[in-house]
Swiss-Prot record:
Gene, per the UniProt record: rpl18a
SUPFAM superfamilies: RplX-like
InterPro entries (alphabetical): Ribosomal_eL20 (IPR028877), Ribosomal_eL20_dom (IPR023573)
Keyword Ribonucleoprotein: yes
One GO CC annotation: ribosome
Bilayer-crossing regions: none
A Pfam family hit: Ribosomal_L18A
Subunit (UniProt): Part of the 50S ribosomal subunit. Binds 23S rRNA.
Biological process terms in GO annotation: translation
Biological source species: Methanosarcina acetivorans (strain ATCC 35395 / DSM 2834 / JCM 12185 / C2A)
Family to which this protein belongs: Belongs to the eukaryotic ribosomal protein eL20 family.
Stated name of the protein: Large ribosomal subunit protein eL20
Record keywords: Ribonucleoprotein, Ribosomal protein, RNA-binding, rRNA-binding
GO molecular function: large ribosomal subunit rRNA binding; structural constituent of ribosome
Amino acid sequence: MVMMKSFIVKGKFKAGSTWEKFTKKIESQNEKNATDKTYSIFGSKHGVKRSQVQIESVAEE
C-alpha cells in the first residue's frame, strides 16, 4: 500500500477578469502528483485551463 502525504498548495486562478487566491489541502504520493491533482480539480470544478492556474507553493504538511 502506498503512503499518502498531505500537501498544502497555494496559488491563484483566473476567475473572469480577476485572479483569486486559493489554498488547498491535497492528499498525494508526492509533490508533483499534488500539483497535477490541483490542476485537475480546478479544471473540473471551475472550468479553467492549466495556464489559468498559477501555483505559488507546495509544502508537505
